[in-house]
Amino acid sequence: MPKYSTEKWWARSSGRLCELARVAISMLAIAAVGVLQPALAAAPKAAASKATEPVMPDLSPWLQKNGEPGQAAWQHAAHFSIAYEIDPGHNTPAPASTQVDAGYTADALWLRFEAQDPHPADIGVHYRVHDGVNSDFDDFVGIFLSPFNDAQWSYEMFCSAGGAEWDAFRQQNNEYSSWDAVWSCTASRTATGYQVVMKIPFASIKFPHSPDPQRWGLIFFRNWPRNLRHQLFSRPLDYDSNCTLCSMEPTRTAAPVTTTPADIQLIPAVTVIRTDTRKDPTEGLAQGSPALKASLDARWVLRPDLEWSATLNPNFSEVAPDVLQLSANRQFALFYKENRPFFEQGTQVFNTPSLRFSSDTFNPSGTLVDTLAINDPRFATKLVGQVGANEIGALITQDTQTNIVLPGPQSSTSQSFDFSTRDELLRYRYDVGASAFGLYASDRDGSGYHSALYATDATWQIDPSDVLTALVGSSSTTYPGAVAGALGTTPGTIDGLLWTLDYARTRHNYNFDLNLSHVADGFRADLGYVPQVGYDQGAFTGEYDFYAPDEEWWQNFAFGTVSNWTRATEGGENLDRKVKLYTALHARYQSRIFLYATRDEQFYQGRIFTLDQYEMDAIAQPAQWLNGEIDVVGGDGVDYLGIRKAQLFSVNTTFYLQPGKHLKIDLVYDYEQLNLAGRRLFTANVYDLRFAWYFTSHLFAQVIGQGQEVRNNTALYPPGTPHHSGTLASQYLIGYQVNPWTVFYAGSSEGYEETVDGQLQPQQRSFFLKGSYYFQPSF
């Protein structure tokens, strides 16, 4: 790899940065007029209300010998009530009583929940590991905690009636369940319900670095699943607002929080794996040699609102595989969720407004930042924090394997290359109330390949109901000859511009969203997920809701539309014109039924296809131990390989079974077929079956089976098309989790592929041990 040069990077990028800066300054000036005026106008009202805000006391004087609050401490705590049902009721009295006591000590926030129940026997209690709580099955309580009280983001921490933890990060209306933290909770049954005690260490959260008392935003929450899933809040919700976090209750600490979080947090990890592979189709698996890999993650809390973290020789091997997605007859690259701890923690600051695609219903949105593009880094480091209203983020990695997606107006391709790249992400955002504006830059460089992207975005919360979002980005990408040849494109440098403007309104009975976008043919986001380029688009979504009176068998009925018009930037062809109408009914047994009718005019490879499709999606929980979803689609489709219209039929099913406290079964099955003039063109099946037995909330065993099978009618396809193909994979695993990063796993996995004679032949077998340990050293 050539030596990385900062001067070279700056020479390439400074001109484009200046160009984007001019655009950014214009956008920020426009945004400031609308953003700052209402924010400043609201300031006196906020100041005047501080005298009536709840105050959390320091519980340290009343701690027991074990360091935990006792009954005397809870009597001195601040008291709250989860008094409102926000769904299905609309700020109606909660059907079950929940009292919350809150306070803090030198190192942690402490919460106690007393959850009463009119029928205690109906409380859903199951063993789960961290993040295993299921809102359809489990009773749980918890908190939305916004330490900066800025209506921009919050932590979510919940504890089930069985003592299992679940946490997430909420950024405005987007929830990221992959975020994890080290905290603890205990749960115990009472004669009239259950009690939960939560301890949230200050070392695990980010909060303002201030000599004054903290002023945090809080909402306490209870999940109460019965015939309907009842969601209970400690604060009333404004249904004419699209800003949930604006409903938080400002709560002060009685004194400044003077604690300094743990300076250093370390997570060493070791993986031992042996992989046997088939080198000759006529022979068995050849036994491999055991390989040991050690890694170290480090987190340094510079101050409560700023942290630096790094990973050396990172261990990114996944214990459980992703749920399979059907890849047959798809236009664009599939999107997968990030599950690697280093990239899950603190990277939400890099998020930018999402993008819409035209005809790809399987991946309806994209993003400028997708850390899965960083495939196999030798090292990675990041700095993230929030100082007042300023949010900052910087991430640098050395990636040893480079994955590149070549997007297009109608399809995308991808290739993996063995050369290394230096990857950099930079983000700055300034928050003003629920509004914000920011700058973003990314750079990827190695072996003659280079991709740079600069962007600016702004969010203007005009009023509680209306929000305007804008994003402008510019990219420059250089493909050397070898890379261009593998991708099937022309060597050289290409540039492109992206912009998107979105206006959304939310009211109690209706909501709508209007979006305009432009993505140039030369635009690239190689450290993001943008598989479609070269289009202009207008899109509209809208819905109107009718709500049932209390005690009815149904909850609400809605009808709406999802429509878009997409035109190619090169040539001006209409790529896609779609109108989708739907109705939806929510009723008892947590049931939801959606009916869709779609007319779609789609342009592909020089042809226009007029497609009519009909869809039914049904979700229900007919029993306390069973939840399922069935989605059926029928009508017209496109055979993208043969470039012809066909008849489509697909069934997608998902079932979750919880027969008892210990056993959990998940089943996903997808079926799809295309027919041409009454003759079967292809049939595809995908299944994912998972059995898990939870001995406790820390110890579990799991078995996973996955398979994909495709059958093609070779008489209707070009010569060389295989008649059938199939894969099968299995995994056996036993795991023990103390917290998200102190874990031990042992297991094995096998992979099979279908041979030309239709037999499944083992191709790979692995045995693995993985352990990691989270600790805070004292120096």
Language-model segment annotations:
Residues 260-309, 419-485, 551, 619, ...:
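Surface-exposed extracellular loop regions of Gram-negative outer-membrane beta-barrel proteins
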